[in-house]
């Protein structure tokens, strides 16, 4: 593709999505952790400006959801809830409350999951919220004043 660079995702499915502003970040454990990513499996995916970052987060969450062993409730149920919210957002049916719940679920999984998969599954969501928040906001359906 001839598109312009938008983001790089490091560390495999539970790594973070890093915007162009951080391209000069050294690829080491500490530096990646400072910007919300991980070294993980050492994978690197490069995305151009045609990439929908909310859908990217949904794609990686679906993978983590499918790979969850189901032993702990935070990961087993949390990844399903997060995937459902991301799917609604991608379809343009999400709400601001969905985004707030997504952030709460990210914190819950990181703090309470028993293994590395559950603890790192929120990384793509957290980094896309941090660096591409406007894409989430653009997907929120028009809400009536309540």
Residue ranges and their predicted role:
Residues 1-146:
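Redox cofactor-anchoring modules in respiratory/redox and cofactor-processing assemblies
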């Amino acid at each position: 593709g001839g598109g312009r660079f938008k983001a790089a995702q490091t560390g495999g499915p539970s790594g973070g999505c890093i915007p162009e502003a951080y391209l000069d970040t050294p690829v080491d454990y500490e530096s990646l952790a400072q910007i919300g990513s991980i070294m993980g499996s050492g994978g690197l995916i490069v995305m151009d400006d045609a990439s929908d970052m909310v859908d990217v987060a949904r794609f990686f969450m679906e993978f983590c959801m499918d790979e969850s062993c189901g032993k702990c409730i935070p990961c087993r149920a949390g990844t399903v809830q997060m995937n459902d919210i991301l799917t609604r957002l991608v379809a343009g049916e999400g709400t601001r409350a969905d985004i707030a719940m997504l952030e709460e679920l990210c914190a819950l999984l990181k703090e309470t999951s028993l293994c590395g998969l559950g603890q790192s599954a929120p990384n793509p969501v957290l980094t896309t919220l941090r660096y591409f928040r406007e894409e989430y906001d653009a997907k929120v359906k028009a809400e009536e004043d309540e």
